[in-house]
Amino acid sequence: MRNLCFTLCALGLAANAAAQMLINGAGATFPYPIYSKWFDDYAKIDPSVRFNYQSIGSGGGQKQILAQTVAFGASDGPMSDENLAKAPGKLLHIPTVAGADVLTYNLPGNPKLKLDGPTIVDIFLGKITRWNDQRLADQNPGVKLPDLDMVVVHRSDGSGTTYIWVDYLSGVSKEWETKVGRGTSVNWPTGLGGKGNEGVAGQIKQLPGAVGYVELIYAKQNKLPYGDVKNAAGNYITPGIESVTEAMSAATIPDDFRFSMVNPTGEKAYPIAGCTWLLVYEQQKDSEKGKKLVEFLNWAINQGESMAAALDYAPLPDNVKQRVLERIKTIQY
């Protein structure tokens, strides 16, 4: 009897596993903490489906959704017109949450620092190479800056976090825009590469004098300091939910939802913020998976948004949320 029970239980588990639908996605590391939370929680709501998300960077997510090797991609940089033209069908940008890119560093005592855009540009151009540079000292009176070499750390993979960062640098510096420009991957003038937000944070944590950029939650998780950045209104702003929300509120959001949030006009807006998108085809080629994907998207925008703040992301404003829900209704399966 015991063996029979064991066999029946095993068969039941196997049947459940076989019945569970797998939906694959890939892309940005920037939203990985909240996406993994969403997928875990949604598995309890609908056990018939499991979402498998590979956090490989926005560039990889865009490539895989274009190749249709995943059901959805994820990116912190909107797809270019050129890439959208390569898609075998109409691709939709579904905004999910917004977050902050932060300048993080590894210094003795890890003091709180303030920096303006031109100073950050010159660090990443390799023009400022030591921590006691006068431009840093002038913005941080009373802070003892060490006589220490800077080690710039940037992303080595195609990255939406990079897209937000260099979009900001291009906006505040014509030299950066001309020499380096925008994109999910650029030719860096200086520095070491790290794979993913995790890789950059890991390098900064290990290297004295290191400086780089990561999404806010990765700095917090790794107990790394991050600087206040001077915004377009002339105020030094701490990155956080309120300052990112103000940045999103100041952004102009077009019908296709491809927009930039960097360097907005708000008095309290953090200047290096960005939205992140799920990329899905309007016409789903697998009707069953398409239906499950749409059900998840509706849940994420309606219920999942409430989880954003706990992970240091800014949820969509109500007016944007309603527009996104209307766009999800256009997905066909």
Model-predicted regions and their roles:
Residues 1-4:
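Positively charged n-region of N-terminal signal peptides that target proteins for export
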Residues 6-7, 17:
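Cleavable N-terminal signal peptides
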Residues 19-333:
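Flexible loop/hinge segments at secondary-structure junctions
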